[in-house]
Amino acid sequence: MTFTGSLDESWFYLVSVAIEARAGPIVPMMLEAIGAARRGDSNKVVECLRHFAERLDELGGLLERMYETCDPHVFYHRIRPYLAGGKNMADAGLPHGVMFDDGTGEQPYVQFSGGSNAQSSIIQFFDIILGVEHRPTGETRSGGSVTEGGSMQTPAHGFIMEMRKYMPGPHRRFLEHVERVANIREYVASRRNNRALVTSYDACLAMLRALRDKHIQIVSRYIIIKSRESRSHSRSLSPKQAASQRLNLANTLQRGNSKKLRGTGGTALIPFLKQARDETGEPAIDAWARRLLNNGPGGIGIADGVATLGKMNEHLTGEVEVVGLAGTWSVDDSEGGVSSFQTCLAQT
């Protein structure tokens, strides 16, 4: 049973479920690694980390299968509106969220995030096991976030923690318990001379970061490009035609200076996903791996006295420029994406 009855929608869900199923065995394996670290069994920890890295690489391959049967046009215009939710959707015509009419006339408006695989416990489990810490979107490593005026502020908590509220209670409590017992990063850091241990740990970070890179590419193809095509089409319509266009709850509405394209989880996901990707490399143990995984956006810079080259076509402002057959377009930091595996990773 799907909203649209389309194979595209079924495939969208199927890929997400396949990732969950393939990732499932990682949980007991890495819990075993935690126990091995407590016993000081480095060989077992290395074995588990190597299998973890290989499985993460497989998950990236599954994620890329989204392209096979889920058409970006169908996803953006037909499927995504049903996943939009009612939180932070004022620009889409839902300033107060949604109201579930029970016939009494007294029901309040409620605001809930749309369906998002950021609500999946498995991706958050990966981060916890590897010691990856995610800050609220826009917050720097020093603990504050930069406002438009350049001042610093400290946000409450991040989107990833918010999504735990949508998890089944046992899943949420399991993650909280794993946070208390996770020891892999500390164990590896205390044995830096064990090259096999350090390399296998850093390889896991690299594979998880690559998975998030692939997700950003999917967001760009399924959301950003389709959003720009939709805007271009809207500008070509006459005022009468434009007024008759059906409102797409998941699309951008141009109201004043507002142009935020929200993800289905209710957040602007491009800055969220970029920051989550960059944070994934921060715990790397080896200095060279850390420089490689934390390579900042755009151009050439200096880190620890070593010249670094930024991510391809990503400027110092964080803006990503893509050059293709249809010309040049850029991913604005204020725009979002899907909040699912063509969405999550995250998240959600």
Language-model regions: role of each:
Residues 1-348:
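Surface-exposed peri-terminal alpha-helical interaction modules
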